[in-house]
Amino acid sequence: MGAEPAEKAPVGASPTGASHTSGSAGSSGGSSSGASSSTPSTSAPTTPSATVPSHVPVLPGSSVTGPATKLPGYTDSAPAGEPLAWHAGSPRVEVSGGVDAFAARFDPGAVRFELHAGSQVPGGSGWPGGNAASTSGLLAGWNGGFLMANNASWGGFYLGGHTAFGPLRTGTASEVFYKDGSMDVLAWPGGLPSTDVVGVRQNLALMIDDGKLAADLNDGTAADERTWGFTNNSADVHGNRSGIGVTVDGKVVYAAVHNASPLQLAQYLQRAGAVRAMQLDINFTRPIFGTYADGRWTEPAPWLGPAGRFTSGNERDFVTVYTR
């Protein structure tokens, strides 16, 4: 596939939102720095709280109308503006939507999440896990956010005691990964990661916090690009977008929308139940998501990038989901 134009960062100051108190992510110690180890000790996160069942063939709360093993082909039966209708997809994955907008929901009691460093972003050596994920127990995966070079993402990357692209930025929206395999989405509270945090991927500001949409989500105006990133067409802020969030009961929700504004992505995440959420990637086939079963990847929409990169070796950071 041909080379894609480089991403352009939003303009303006980095976010400075207050920390969220849902879980213990950072400590009050000083800023983390490149290739440094974290030492502060704090309590384990309270959200999400993972209780690992011995066997979970279908997630709690699924509205299963028949056998379903593949992600594509579902129709969102909920009227516009109402909560999404969920279905059982691949084992331990709930899904909703179709080819223009879809969401996947994961219960941290049934699955675990892993952050991976890419061979080029963040690059370098010594990162745990490698840039090609194991297929043992693999369920799904998605790619990270904006390029972290030149402050495009308003933040940094932390994994296995080391950071890249400067210290983690206070207030920046962050995927936070814990030792127990759970994850959270929150505004980084500042300081070094606590000892129960194994990974952090930062990107822009929260789109949703405390169940409320961010005040600077403008429906298709130029202000959107200054905050949420420039699209392929400078005259139109609509593009392919992905995001990640958490529900009030700790489930993790991934969503992707086709040719949509930042507000439309945030509204879709909100309909999926997210009370905190952040944008991940935008434009072209940069948003990547797939489910893994029977030795192969399945992408739910043709405008997504190939998820096979996650097991063959990916140049940029990504997240994988495994069965517990």
What do these predicted regions represent?
Residues 20, 47, 200, 207, ...:
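Pepsin/retropepsin-fold aspartyl endopeptidases
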